[in-house]
């Protein structure tokens, strides 16, 4: 049965033991079965008879290493004596010294050094024993190696010296630094020395690369230079290799990458560098291990794991090279401490050894009938709360009194002070202030003033004592707490007083109040502190005559507060000078440590029997002081205390089994003291008299009985490697017996303290949380007995030292500073004879403690000279402080020489000491033999106690490091140094080791102070130095405790006894110094920093003054009295600080109030903004969902209509082809019929559009754009030129004139209303359309009318009777007579590309007839015709004699223009002599005029897009109302859904009118839904490509509004103020992403993307809500009334019915690869489009098949026109790519100034007219061509901005698969 080691370690102790026991039973069973099977073999029994008993022999080397590891020094000596080689190497290549340095075996290390082992031996990693000793922090080994001549500058494989591995602040580091400094080696030399090896390799690599070497070259094992540099940690070399193309992921023969090596050898910086350069962390070596699997530290492993995650993300989404490096802000030197080798595993016992020791514990308990009968458990959940009856809290606080502060008394003398204190004590007012000092009188009874309610009452936000509360300990704590964060400096409480004055109880109350500041962890910390105090009282307190709970050690509590949260986070306890001698002997009337009495009274009889404990009198350590038998109540109380102690031990981390083990050790200590010795020979050699007791003690300690007996009675010494054994006398044996007991108890006490520190230790401390500390120092009090010995001397020496420190802080420092600063003092302080007393004890080298230590080093056989030396010291000392008892206090010689007695004049009085036996009591060093035995103990706790090191203060070294002071010197040694910094340094620093041998070791040892022996005196000196050092870092708060009487009686006040205490404490001096002195002394900078709010408030304009002046101004502004200014400091009274703090607090409250108001205002504003945004989001979402639903329905309807339209169009195309000959024959007949029925049709019957006589673009695109959105019609060339002129006169004519001959250059100055004539019966005709025959039926073909022939016109015919008078020169006047009809229909961008019907042949010249055109007057002018009357305008054009064919047609295309906004002044600024002089409402018309579409009137501003011609009669047709299903706002009755809607606010006086055909579906007009605000104009882009809209028409059955919504004026596009003749800009974006196409036949379109400037729609305003502000509005309303309808003459229809002209318009040009490629990609063999998105600028085009216009398939009688398909424009454009027309169109599109391009177009047309060529010949003949206009720059306004979306519906709504 096998089990994983990790799983075994994770199991609880009890479960693991059961599992191991079962496994062991199975192993034994298997073993027996195997043995039985083996015995059955033949001949086994015979061989067994002749065989000897087998013995296992181990190699001496293995046994020697095992003995060194387990500190079995006796075994080591035996093995060395038997011949074991001390020069044996271990498996890592190191020597036995490496093993001794690893396991801190200094004794064996000294033996090995004496035997010649090399102290500088290096293992496989070049580690010396010094490296290991520093890494493990074993100062004894370090000092031993240094004294043995070890080279401290040797480097390991990583280039680190031993100092690099020594943690800063440790003793090992101190030894090395002192040694190097003693020998003249500084850190700069060390840094340069360390850089020699990496710089050498850097030089070699540079030379190798400069000579052309391959940076990735491998050696025989596949190792590259990068591998070597990464393993060695040479960062500069690695950087150089990477700069020259080094492969990051290159592998050697074992598949190790440089990252593997850097991680394995702990090169943290290189790991980071490789990861920054994108090294792959997922690569594995030959062992299938990634770099993170073999990382030398957890930090490197964590960094690699993060890199692995980042690498995986990089594979999904590539990251930049610097991304990984920026994920974690690693510092340049990430770890101060270099990563240790793996051979330095944690110092813990293997799990097998732990289980073995535990089993032996259990076996021992079973053998001795131990205490525990239940199964062991790892931890037993205990109630953390202390047991006790819950009583209601009582609060009884006295009101504040005038005498709360003694410094305010009017009369200051000893009597008055004593009287006030006595009066307050009688009123249970035990606390009194002396300034900031608290005076406490022990009441010897419980007072209800320490409850949690009282603690909360004293909570303060500023630390100032509430005026309604009396003085209290809690108020002093509050002041210190707030001062901690105000000063950012640790605080400390110093409690002083005699034994029994209440210091320990006061410290507990301080801790209790501070735990209330622990936040959420208050209950936990408070409970832990209670349990910790319980343990300390049991193991460190004793009962004396002065105090029933007297502290026998010095404790220093350190409470840690989080600086950010200002809460208590953890604590730590420091213990000093445990009174160990009390264990062995107690003074008269005093007891031993309380724990033994708790065991004797608290354990049951059975438990005591298991521990062999009897009554108190049976044990020597407990029966020295005769005591009366404890009462039953006392025993019961001890039993309860023991139960509480067990629970406390459980809380701090001890299991029940471990608690029982502690009790076993304590019982062993008691039994150890009972061992007696006897002499059996004349040599007085000691032997143990009771071997059974010895065996019992050895069993409890789990050591060998013989070894324990030998260690107690003999001593082993080594001289030059030889072991010398010396027998002890009885006296010496008893001394070592007691010394072993004291050492065991003191180490156990330190072990408990360390365990409690682990419990109180803050878990957040390791996270580098900034903490501030509050310390509480509780020292044992001053004492005096009838016989005062060495113990009382140590206690009183400590009190003397602390009293001197208090006086220094309170008096001497102030006195010195006042003298230095030139400030006068009213009081003076004299230290008295304290300095003489302290010098007598602590002076070196002639002080009492030094003398005692010297005598303690003498061997036992030498007679002591201590009395003589002591008398000599007394004679030389200050007689006022110390004098010999040979003389009395008056200097008289005494009769008897006491020898070791002397008298000390302490601050508290005169005390005589007798130091007999002080030398033995001072010794505290166990013999090596006893250490050998205790280190081999199988008791886990005992083994740990004696293998752990002791600090210089005598305490056990803590198990966990002090993170607060942790650091490393390698941060100084590893600083980056460039190559230039060491160039030229030829000094060989490797020879620095010679400097280390120049001086001896005496000075070195003196500086280390390591020469001091391990004595009580040395521990006392070190402890006091440590305590004073802690206090000096803090701001002190003094609490003086006073005993009211010497009998421990409550309510008893001994005036004489209290007066004596007040005098030696110096209460009167304290009162005077606080009243007249300056206890608050701050430097100028500290003052301004502490009271910064006041300084900022009072020194607004005076901050440039000196610091002293600023401090003075602040104090003057605060109106304080009694302060003084020194040279560098401010001297304040103690109440000044409180007043200044109050002023700061008031300012802070005002600031907080202001901030609260502002934050509330901002919060409300933010809330309102969020609510508004939320409402807008909800509205937008609802609107979006509704629009999406509406558009989806519209799309469905459009697809249905498209299907029907495609079918009709196809049938109409076939019918047209079949009826073409018939139409040619009946041309004249139709003309005659049309001429005859002209008047009749005008008066009655519906009006018709004839498919053969009009441009299909006008109706098809108009209807199709209701689905597309933006305008597809733009003003013609003439209207563009005429928009800038608005000066004209109304026509007085109301009847048509005679029909004169007309000039071909005559232009119709048609008004906007005439061009955009409306249908008054649009709503009635919508319902009639469903009942009439479809276009493809027979009825439709019979009703077609033949248009009349084109009349002959005179070029000199002028237009008369127009709405406005035409002024200025006409461009047609300069044109030759031989170019009639040369003017072509010019389409601005977005205009449908239609192939116009050919003009009449020249043979019709004689048959010319006049053409009547119907016009309306200006409805808004008073002199205009009436709205119900028509104005007939006469136009007549005669062809010249030499004229060619009539007006042909050519194509222009571009972007559809939006409205041009112009100021009125710009409008009037047009020059009169411009090329275009027709006023804006009347465009310069083209020779071809399709029938006009008349819409319901709306006040529009766009100009007509129809190609008006002087030869084209007008025919008024009512268009059907389209159902768009866009759910736009419904227009009122009388308004057309097909007409543009513009608000009055959007149209200015100078705005150019647009075509009604454009406005019908203009995206910038009212018909389009709201769009996003336009982006800024983009840079010029490529010219927009033409598109071909869908070949279908939508005719819904019901009319529906077109306008979807109106944007506000803020959503308008930027207004453009063009110059005269400026070209229009690009139109707005389309409202739909795609044009729906027929499910039967796909759209014949070549949709291209084109740029345009987004033009948002203007706000919608229905006509009914807008006043008539212009003649156009009035005329539109006239049209809406239906009173006037224009009629197109039959002649006009005949003009456009040209015969004999048919062109295949579907042939695309091969010269334009882009067009052909796009066409081939987007069209199938039937020329069908597939999902190409419409351009937003080329928003209309007309389709045709084979050059023929395709009708819409609707009958004429229904009022619908036969409209052409929108594919004609594209196919025509593709055919004539190389023609002059195409070139002109391209130049127009690329023109930066379109007006210039239009002027060039007119010139080109004029040139064509002059040549007199037939337009058809121009189209069909390639030679010689007229050169096109010169190229112009690309217009910047024609490009669509990036990101401007023309789509309102997503592409998903258009199913391209239909």
Swiss-Prot record:
Domain (IQ) ranges: 1147-1176
GO biological process: cerebellum development; negative regulation of cell population proliferation; negative regulation of G1/S transition of mitotic cell cycle; neuron projection morphogenesis; phosphatidylinositol 3-kinase/protein kinase B signal transduction
Residue ranges with Basic residues bias: 1346-1355
Family: In the N-terminal section; belongs to the TRAFAC class myosin-kinesin ATPase superfamily. Myosin family.
Keyword entries, A-Z: Actin-binding, ANK repeat, ATP-binding, Cytoplasm, Motor protein, Myosin, Nucleotide-binding, Phosphoprotein, Repeat
InterPro entries attached to this UniProt entry: Ankyrin_rpt (IPR002110), Ankyrin_rpt-contain_sf (IPR036770), Kinesin_motor_dom_sf (IPR036961), Myosin-XVI (IPR052838), Myosin_head_motor_dom-like (IPR001609), MYSc_Myo16 (IPR036042), NYAP_C (IPR029353), NYAP_N (IPR039482)
Region annotated Involved in CYFIP1- and NCKAP1-binding, chain positions: 1111-1377
Annotated residues for binding of ATP: 497-504
Subcellular location: Cytoplasm
Species this chain originates from: Homo sapiens
Keyword ATP-binding: yes
Top-level lineage group: Eukaryota
Region entry Disordered, spans: 373-392, 1219-1250, 1282-1307, 1326-1409, 1448-1674, 1697-1731, 1747-1778, 1821-1844
Principal subcellular localisation of the protein: cytoplasm
Protein's UniProt name: Unconventional myosin-XVI
GO cellular component terms listed in the entry, alphabetical order: cytoplasm; myosin complex; nucleoplasm; perinuclear region of cytoplasm; plasma membrane
Positions with biased composition (Polar residues): 1533-1545, 1715-1731, 1763-1773
Compositionally biased residues, Basic and acidic residues: 1219-1245
Oligomer and partners: Binds PPP1CA and/or PPP1CC. Binds F-actin in an ATP-sensitive manner. Interacts with ACOT9, ARHGAP26 and PIK3R2. Interacts with components of the WAVE1 complex, CYFIP1 and NCKAP1; this interaction mediates PI3K-WAVE1 association and actin cytoskeleton remodeling. Interacts with KIRREL3.
PTM remark: Phosphorylated on tyrosine residues by FYN upon stimulation with CNTN5.
Pro residues: bias regions: 1478-1499, 1570-1587, 1656-1665
GO molecular function ontology, one term from the record: actin filament binding
Low complexity: bias regions: 1370-1385
């Amino acid at each position: 049965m096998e089990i994983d080691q990790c799983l075994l370690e994770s199991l609880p102790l009890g479960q693991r033991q059961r599992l191991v026991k079962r496994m062991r039973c199975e192993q034994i069973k298997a073993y027996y079965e195997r043995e039985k099977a083996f015995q059955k073999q033949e001949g086994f029994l015979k061989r067994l008879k002749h065989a000897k008993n087998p013995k296992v022999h181990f190699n001496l080397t293995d046994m020697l290493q095992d003995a060194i590891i387990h500190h079995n020094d006796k075994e080591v000596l035996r093995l060395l004596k038997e011949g074991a080689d001390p020069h044996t190497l271990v498996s890592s290549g190191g020597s036995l010294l490496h093993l001794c340095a690893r396991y801190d075996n200094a004794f064996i290390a000294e033996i090995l050094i004496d035997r010649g082992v090399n102290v500088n031996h290096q293992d496989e990693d070049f580690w010396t024993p010094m490296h290991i000793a520093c890494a493990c922090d074993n100062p004894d080994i370090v000092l031993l190696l240094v004294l043995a001549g070890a080279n401290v500058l040797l480097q390991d494989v990583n280039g680190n010296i031993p100092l690099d591995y020594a943690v800063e602040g440790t003793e090992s580091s101190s030894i090395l630094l002192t040694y190097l400094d003693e020998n003249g080696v500084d850190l700069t030399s060390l840094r340069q020395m360390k850089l020699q090896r990496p710089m050498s390799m850097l030089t070699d690599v540079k030379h190798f690369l400069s000579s052309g070497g391959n940076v990735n070259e491998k050696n025989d094992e596949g190792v590259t230079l990068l591998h070597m540099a990464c393993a060695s940690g040479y960062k500069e070399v690695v950087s150089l290799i990477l700069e020259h193309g080094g492969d990051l992921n290159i592998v050697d023969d074992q598949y190790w990458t440089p990252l593997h090596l850097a991680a394995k050898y702990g090169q943290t910086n290189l790991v980071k560098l490789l990861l920054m350069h994108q090294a792959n962390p997922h690569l594995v070596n030959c062992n299938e291990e990634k770099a993170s699997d073999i990382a030398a530290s957890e930090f490197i492993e964590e960094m690699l794991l993060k890199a692995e995650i980042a690498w995986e993300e990089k594979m999904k989404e590539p990251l930049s090279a610097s991304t990984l490096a920026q994920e974690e802000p690693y510092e340049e030197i990430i770890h101060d401490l270099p990563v240790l080798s793996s051979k330095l595993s944690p110092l813990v016992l293997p799990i097998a050894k732990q289980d073995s020791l535990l089993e032996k514990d259990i076996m021992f308990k079973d053998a001795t009938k131990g205490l525990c009968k239940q199964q062991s458990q790892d931890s037993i959940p205990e109630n953390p709360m202390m047991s006790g009856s819950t009583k209601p809290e009582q609060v009884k606080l006295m009101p504040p009194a005038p005498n709360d502060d003694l410094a305010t008394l009017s009369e200051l003398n000893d009597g008055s002070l004593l009287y006030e204190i006595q009066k307050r004590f009688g009123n249970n007012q035990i606390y009194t202030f002396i300034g900031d000092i608290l005076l406490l009188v022990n009441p010897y009874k419980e007072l209800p003033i320490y409850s949690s309610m009282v603690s909360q009452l004293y909570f303060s936000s500023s630390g100032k004592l509430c005026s309604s509360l009396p003085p209290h300990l809690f108020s002093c704590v509050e002041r210190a707490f707030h001062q901690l964060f105000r000063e950012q400096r640790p605080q400390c409480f110093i409690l002083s007083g005699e034994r029994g004055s209440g210091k320990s109880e006061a410290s507990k109350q301080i801790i209790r109040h501070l735990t209330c500041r622990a936040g959420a962890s208050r209950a936990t910390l408070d409970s832990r502190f209670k349990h910790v105090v319980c343990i300390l009282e049991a193991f460190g307190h004793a009962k004396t005559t002065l105090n029933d709970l007297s502290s026998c050690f010095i404790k220093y509590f350190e409470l840690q507060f989080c600086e950010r949260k200002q809460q208590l986070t953890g604590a730590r306890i420091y213990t000093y000078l445990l009174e160990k001698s009390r264990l062995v002997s107690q003074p008269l009337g005093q007891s031993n440590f309380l724990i033994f009495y708790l065991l004797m009274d608290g354990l049951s009889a059975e438990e005591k029997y298991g521990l062999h404990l009897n009554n108190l009198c049976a044990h020597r350590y407990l029966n020295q002081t005769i005591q009366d038998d404890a009462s039953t109540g006392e025993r019961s109380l001890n039993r309860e205390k023991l139960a509480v102690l067990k629970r406390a031990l459980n809380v701090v981390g001890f299991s029940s089994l471990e608690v029982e083990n502690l009790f076993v050790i304590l019982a062993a200590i008691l039994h150890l003291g009972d061992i007696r010795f006897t002499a059996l020979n004349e040599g007085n050699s000691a032997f143990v008299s009771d071997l059974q007791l010895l065996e019992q003690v050895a069993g409890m300690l789990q050591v060998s009985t013989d070894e324990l007996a030998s260690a107690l009675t003999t001593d082993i010494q080594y001289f030059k490697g030889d072991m010398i054994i010396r027998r002890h006398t009885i006296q010496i044996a008893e001394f070592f017996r007691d010394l072993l007991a004291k050492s065991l108890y003191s180490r156990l006490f330190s072990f408990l303290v360390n365990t409690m520190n682990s419990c109180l230790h803050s878990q957040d401390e390791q996270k580098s949380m900034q903490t501030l500390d509050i310390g509480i120092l509780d020292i044992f009090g001053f004492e005096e007995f009838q016989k005062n010995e060495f113990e009382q001397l140590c206690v009183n020496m400590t009190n003397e030292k602390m009293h001197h420190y208090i006086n220094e802080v309170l008096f001497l420092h102030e006195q010195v500073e006042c003298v230095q600063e030139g400030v006068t003092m009213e009081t003076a302080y004299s230290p008295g004879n304290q300095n003489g007393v302290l010098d007598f004890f602590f002076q070196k080298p002639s002080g009492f403690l030094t003398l005692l230590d010297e005598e303690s080093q003498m061997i036992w056989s030498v007679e002591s000279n201590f009395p003589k030396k002591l008398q000599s010291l007394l004679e030389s000392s200050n007689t006022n402080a110390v004098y010999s008892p040979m003389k009395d206090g008056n200097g008289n010689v005494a009769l008897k020489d006491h020898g070791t007695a002397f008298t000390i004049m302490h601050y508290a009085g005169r005390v005589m000491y007798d130091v007999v036996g002080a030398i033995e009591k001072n010794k505290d060093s166990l013999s090596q033999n006893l250490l050998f035995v205790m280190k081999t103990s199988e008791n886990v706790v005992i083994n740990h106690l004696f293998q752990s090191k002791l600090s210089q203060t005598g305490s056990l070294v803590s198990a966990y490091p002090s993170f607060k002071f942790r650091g490393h010197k390698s941060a100084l040694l590893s600083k980056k140094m460039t190559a230039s910094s060491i160039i030229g340094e030829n000094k060989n620093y490797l020879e620095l080791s010679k400097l280390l041998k120049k001086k001896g070791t005496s000075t070195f040892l003196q500086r280390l102070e390591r020469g001091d022996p391990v004595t009580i005196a040395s521990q006392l000196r070190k402890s006091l130095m440590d305590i004073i050092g802690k206090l000096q870092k803090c701001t002190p708060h003094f609490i003086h405790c006073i005993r009211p009487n010497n009998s421990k009686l409550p309510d008893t006040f001994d005036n004489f006894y209290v007066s004596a205490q007040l005098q030696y404490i110096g209460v009167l001096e304290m009162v005077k110094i606080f009243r007249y002195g300056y206890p608050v002394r701050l430097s100028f900078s500290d003052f301004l920093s502490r009271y910064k709010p006041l300084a900022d408030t009072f020194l607004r304009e005076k901050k440039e003054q000196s610091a002293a002046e600023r401090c003075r101004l602040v104090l003057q502004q605060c109106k304080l009295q009694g302060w003084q200014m020194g040279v560098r400091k401010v001297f304040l009274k103690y109440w000044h600080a409180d007043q200044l703090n109050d002023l700061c607090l008031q300012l802070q409250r005002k600031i907080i109030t202001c901030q609260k108001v502002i934050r509330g205002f901002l919060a409300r504003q933010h809330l309102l903004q969020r609510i508004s945004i939320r409402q807008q989001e909800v509205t937008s979402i609802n609107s979006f969902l509704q629009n999406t639903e509406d558009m989806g329905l519209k799309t469905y309807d459009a697809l249905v209509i498209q299907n029907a339209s495609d079918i009709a169009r196809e049938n109409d195309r076939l019918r047209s082809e079949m009826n073409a000959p018939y139409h040619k024959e009946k041309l004249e007949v139709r003309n005659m019929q049309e001429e005859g029925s002209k008047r009749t049709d005008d008066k009655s019957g519906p009006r018709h559009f004839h498919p053969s006589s009009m441009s299909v673009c006008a109706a098809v695109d108009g209807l199709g754009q209701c689905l597309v959105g933006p305008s597809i019609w733009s003003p013609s060339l003439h209207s563009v030129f005429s928009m800038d002129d608005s000066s004209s006169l109304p026509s007085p004519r109301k009847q048509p004139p005679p029909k004169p001959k007309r000039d071909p250059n005559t232009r119709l100055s048609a008004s906007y209303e005439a061009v955009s004539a409306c249908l008054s019966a649009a709503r009635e005709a919508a319902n009639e359309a469903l009942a009439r025959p479809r276009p493809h039926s027979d009825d439709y073909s019979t009703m077609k009318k033949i248009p009349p022939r084109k009349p002959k016109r005179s070029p000199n015919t002028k237009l008369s009777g127009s709405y406005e008078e035409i002024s200025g020169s006409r461009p047609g006047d300069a044109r030759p007579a031989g170019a009639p009809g040369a003017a072509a229909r010019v389409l601005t961008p977005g205009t449908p590309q239609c192939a116009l019907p050919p003009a009449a042949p020249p043979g019709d010249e004689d048959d010319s007839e006049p053409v009547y055109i119907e016009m309306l007057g200006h409805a808004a002018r008073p002199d205009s015709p009436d709205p119900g009357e028509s104005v007939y305008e006469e136009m007549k054009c005669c062809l010249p004699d030499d004229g060619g064919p009539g007006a042909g047609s050519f194509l222009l295309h571009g972007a559809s223009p939006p409205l041009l906004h112009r100021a009125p002044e710009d409008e009037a600024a047009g020059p009169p002599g411009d090329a275009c002089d027709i006023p804006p409402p009347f465009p310069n018309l083209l020779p071809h005029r399709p029938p006009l579409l008349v819409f319901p009137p709306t006040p529009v501003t766009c100009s007509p897009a129809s190609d008006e011609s002087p030869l084209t009669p007008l025919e008024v047709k009512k268009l059907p109302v389209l159902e768009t299903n866009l759910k736009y706002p419904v227009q009122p009755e009388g308004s057309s859904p097909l007409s543009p809607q513009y608000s009055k606010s959007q149209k200015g006086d100078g705005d150019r009118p647009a075509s009604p055909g454009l406005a019908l579906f203009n995206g910038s007009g009212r018909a389009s839904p709201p769009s996003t605000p336009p982006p800024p104009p983009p840079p010029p882009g490529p010219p927009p490509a033409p598109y071909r809209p869908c070949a279908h028409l939508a005719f819904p059955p019901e009319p529906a509004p077109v306008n979807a919504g109106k944007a506000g004026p803020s959503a308008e596009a930027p207004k453009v103020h063009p110059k005269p003749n400026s070209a229009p800009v690009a139109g707005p974006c389309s409202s739909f992403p795609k044009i729906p196409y027929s499910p039967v036949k796909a759209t014949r379109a070549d949709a291209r993307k084109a740029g345009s400037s987004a033009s948002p729609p203007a706000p919608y305003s229905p006509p009914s809500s807008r006043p008539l502000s212009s003649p156009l509005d009035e005329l539109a309303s006239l049209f809406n009334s239906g009173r006037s309808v224009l009629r197109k003459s039959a002649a006009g229809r005949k003009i456009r019915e040209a015969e004999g002209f048919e062109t295949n318009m579907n042939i695309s040009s091969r010269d334009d690869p882009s067009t052909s490629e796009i066409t081939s990609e987007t069209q199938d063999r039937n020329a069908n489009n597939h999902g190409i998105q419409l351009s937003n600028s080329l928003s209309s085009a007309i389709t045709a098949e084979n050059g023929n216009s395709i009708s819409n398939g609707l009958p004429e009688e229904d009022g619908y026109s036969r409209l052409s398909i929108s594919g004609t424009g594209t196919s025509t454009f593709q055919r004539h790519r190389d023609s002059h027309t195409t070139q002109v169109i391209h130049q127009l599109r690329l023109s930066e100034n379109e007006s210039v391009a239009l002027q060039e177009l007119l010139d080109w047309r004029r040139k064509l007219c002059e040549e007199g060529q037939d337009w058809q010949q121009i189209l069909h003949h390639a030679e010689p061509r007229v050169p096109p206009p010169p190229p112009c720059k690309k217009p910047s306004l024609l490009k669509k901005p990036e990101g401007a979306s023309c789509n309102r519906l997503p592409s998903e709504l258009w199913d391209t698969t239909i």
